[in-house]
Every structure is written in structure tokens, then in C-alpha cells.
Amino acid sequence: MAYVLTETAAGYALLKASDKKIYKSSSLVQDLKSSENVLKQFKVAAFSKFASAANALEEANSVIEGKVSSQLEKLLAEAKSDKKSTLVVSETKLANAINKLGLNFNVVCDAVTLDIYRAVKEYLPELLPGMTDGDLSKMSLGLAHSIGRHKLKFSADKVDVMIIQAIALLDDLDKELNTYAMRCKEWYGWHFPELAKIVTDSVAFARIILTMGVRSNAAETDMSEILPEEIEERVKSAAEVSMGTEITQVDLDNIKSLAEQIVEFAAYREQLSNYLSSRMKAIAPNLTQLVGELVGARLIAHAGSLVSLAKAPASTIQILGAEKALFRALKTKHDTPKYGLLYHASLVGQATGKNKGKIARVLAAKAAVSLRYDALAEDRDDSGDIGLEARAKVESRLSQLEGRDLRTTPKVSRDAKKIEISEARAYNADADAATAPADSTPADSDDEEEEEKKVKKDKKDKKRKREEDAEEEDSKKSKKEKKEKKEKKEKKEKKEKKEKKEKKEKKEKKEKK
């Protein structure tokens, strides 16, 4: 006996096939080409209706995840017989789950079953009594929307997609701002070349162009809102003796248009940076406290989502962003990179030399814990206490490695060590003597002689040890060479013996003939 389990938007349908070995048929596609053949081949053995739309969503998710719900288990238990029957299922995970139940079914799910399901789905309204094509389409559409909403799990506070887009836009804005600022300095530099050396800030440079216009207006222009007083004086004095060429009003208008773009871009960049900061504090407060908004946002963007990053181990977080260097190192059998995007974290930046790698490893481990709390904790608060605690521990480790106090995170204050004040010595007049007795030898000279002897002895010991090591290496090499020579000699002798034997055998054969 063969059954086909069909999941519809209305409920579970268990179809009984008239041919027991339908899934083994060689002409299956031809047999199920028309509605008459399908209706003749399959009949509804049992149907379990969904109670509501919520129930339909729950059952559909169970099938997608490869789980057997209580409703489906009940349907299969009622349909099972004493003889072992074949059950055709569409999902491999679901087939494995049904097998584990221990029901009297031989569960089948392979490429052939797809043809059966294609035919059943096409003529499903005709197979199910009291079900029209329109009703089934409406139910399927409603269920599809419900599954889509369930998968998205939309929440205004936990949309990491916004972070990914914001950090990508922020990087693009930085590139555009740098390009525009460089072009503006080069363009206006023909008229007032000294200004770029005095005012290095791009936004301030653009605002001066908008306020001042041509350099001849510098003396009458008030720049106190843009520049400090001493720099303003330098700009005005440089404008009087500038080596730049004169420009027309049309040129100035175009330069001003570019300067306006720079000012607007800078204002929008600041607004976007504040938005990203607030989003990061809402979505990943602990990660933000530990590595900062920008590094945290780049990690999330690189991983694809907060949950994907939270699932990653600390070793992956440590080298995230250095994939090219990692695979190049593995290919060439060199040392693998110690850090990726975490290199830009302030804590790694405070470390020096070889300590950077150690701090990156510690920071990655703490970031993994903070991320899992941010992404997966049910009763999470947005205070970022776990991130602060983790940062304090990383700072403590950094201070220990660097040998100086680098802690910035507030910590429980310990009792200050008491300072002991010792009495000053009385003045010793005898110590002012110009000369000391000739026969009295100072104790310091004896100590120095002993130290010199000790240093010489250490040097001799080291030299002797080096010589012994060199001799040992030479002896090892000579032994190895002797062994290799012996092996070569033995191989040569064996080869010669073999050749002699073969010649002898050939000679004997010839004589016999």
C-alpha cells in the first residue's frame, strides 16, 4: 500500500495510490499527464483540517523546519496498518523525522517523488472534495504572506539592515567628501594657493570660500565663526601678498557651488553618524560599549547580520575583514593575520607591537560574549553593562601587558596605599673628608670584582656550551652521512647481485636451448 502526504493551505491530505509501486514506475510522467489518470490513481484516504490561519502558519513552519507536529503525527498514526506501507514525502528533513517516530511506514523522498508531487499539486482542487481552485489560491496566498512576515520577524528596534546600509553610506560619503574637498582646494588654489596650507580642515576651507569669495575681500570679511583669531589674522595677511591668479565671477560661482556641496555633505555625514550611533546603542549596546559604533557596525555589515555575527566563534570575529590575507598566508604557508576589522578598535590601537595580537584575541573573545547577549538574550536591557564589564577586563589585561595604567572605564576604587615617612638622617661631618686612608679598601670594589668574575664565568660557560652544541651537531651530521653512504652501498650491491643473477639465468636458458 502506498500513500502520498500532501501539505496544503487548508490542511494535511493523505492520498492513497491505487498502484502500490507507483514511485518505481518507469512511465510515471506519462501515466500522470492527464487529470483522469491522476484522479484514477489517487484517492483521499484522510484529511486533517487546520483550525485557523495561525494553526496553518505553525504547521507550515514545522514542515519547513523538518519537524513532525502532533496533528501530523495523529494523522499518520490513524492511517498506519499492520502491513508495512510506503509513504511518499516531499521534504528530506520531514522524512527523517517521520522515520524516527517508529510508525509502520517505509518513507520515500527522492527525485522520482517530485514528479508525483508535480501532478498532485496541479490537480489538487479536483482531488480534494468540497475545495475549489479559487478557495485554495486565497488560502495559499494568505499562508504565504504569514510565512513571509514570520521569517522577517520585523522589529523597529532590532533592524540590523539599517546599520549595514548606514555604515556603507557613511564610507561612501567619506570617499566623496575627500574627493570633493581635494578638487575644491586645487580649483581655488589657483586664486589663493596659501589658504590650503593655513586652513587644513576641508569644511572650514569651503565655508571660507562661501563667506569671503575672492581673496581681495579677506580684509573686510569676518571669519570669527569659522576660524580662531590667530588663524584668521594669518589668512588675512596671506591674502594681501598672495601669489595666486585672478579669477572671473563665473569661475567663483562654480567653485562656490562645489563648496556648498561639501558643507551640505559634511552636515549630512554628521547627522548619519549620530543616527548610526543611536541605532547601534539600540541593537547592540554591549558590542558598542566594547569596540565602538563604527567598528561594531562594520563587523555586523561584514557578517551580514547581528545573529550571523553572534553565531561566529571568537577566532572568526578576530580575523573578520582579513580573509584575503588569511587565505594568502595559508596558501604560502606563512603566519596567519592576528586581526582584521578589530585592528581599528581603540583598545587594540592603545597596545604596542607584539601586544596588539594578544589584545585583539582577548577583545574578540569578549566581543563574542557581548554579541551573543545582544542578539539572543530574551530579557536584555540597553544599558550595555556586560560590554562595560568586558571592556574593563580588556583594559586591565592591556595595562598588565604594557606595564602602565591604561584603564579608562570606571572601576571600584581600592584603598590608597599609605605613605610611610622616615626621619631624615643627621648631618655627618666626617663624610666631608677630602681623602680616605690608603690601606682601607672600600666594600664596593670587592663587590664589583666579584660581579666581573661572575660575568666572565657566565661568558665562558656560554662559549663552552655553544662549542659543545656545535660538536654535537657535527657528530649528528657525520653519523647521518655515514648511514646514507652505507644505505647507498647496500642498494648498489643488491642491484649488482640482481643483475648477475639475471645474466646467469639468461645464459642457462640459452645453453638449454
Curated annotation (Swiss-Prot):
It comes from Eremothecium gossypii (strain ATCC 10895 / CBS 109.51 / FGSC 9923 / NRRL Y-1056) (Yeast). Its main location: nucleus. Residues 456-465, 477-513 have a biased composition (Basic residues). Residues 429-443 have a biased composition (Low complexity). The lineage of its organism: Eukaryota, Fungi, Dikarya, Ascomycota, Saccharomycotina. PANTHER family: NUCLEOLAR PROTEIN 5 NUCLEOLAR PROTEIN NOP5 NOP58 (PTHR10894), NUCLEOLAR PROTEIN 58 (PTHR10894:SF1). It comes from the Eukaryota. It is found in: Nucleus, Nucleolus. One of its GO terms (biological process) is endonucleolytic cleavage in 5'-ETS of tricistronic rRNA transcript (SSU-rRNA, 5.8S rRNA, LSU-rRNA). Required for pre-18S rRNA processing. May bind microtubules. Keywords: Nucleus, Ribonucleoprotein, Ribosome biogenesis, rRNA processing. Residues 428-513 are annotated as: Disordered. GO terms for cellular component: box C/D methylation guide snoRNP complex; nucleolus; small-subunit processome. The keyword rRNA processing applies. Belongs to the NOP5/NOP56 family. GO terms for molecular function: snoRNA binding; snRNA binding. Residues 283-403 form the Nop domain. This is Nucleolar protein 58.
